Amino acid sequence: MATREVGFIMTEEYKAWIDDIKNRIRQSQIKASVRINYELLDLYWELGRDIVNKQQNAEWGDSFIAMMSKDLQKTFPGMSGFSQQNLRSIRYWYQFYHNCSNDLQAVSKLKTIENMVKSIPWGHNQRIMYKCKSIDEALFYVQKTMDNNWSRSV
């Protein structure tokens, strides 16, 4: 049954159309969130690589992470993710998968791994990398998280 709104008759067709628009908006929001997450993790991957390289090549040791954290937090005060602990986690995350690439004997496999781990949220990545003993075990949980939309509590 149609209802009237100031010169407009609301039909079932209109309601279905609005429902479709709402669903498309929600899907766009989800896609945007996934893309934002991927870009953030892409940044984290690059930061991890840079931290590892600076520690090896510039011989800065571990203490520069505290200064790096202060500098980034000062420049981006409202942005989380640049604490000393998180920067250390970012470094560990990069090393965990990068160091294990020798066992996989393929650069293309590392790129596949990189794309996989960037497809799940940072909190999930942290939980997986700290709990798993091997890259195979970690990738199992990354894949299951992607396939089943697992939360961190699983």
For each feature predicted by the language model, list its residue ranges:
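Basic, low-complexity intrinsically disordered segments
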Residues: M1-V154
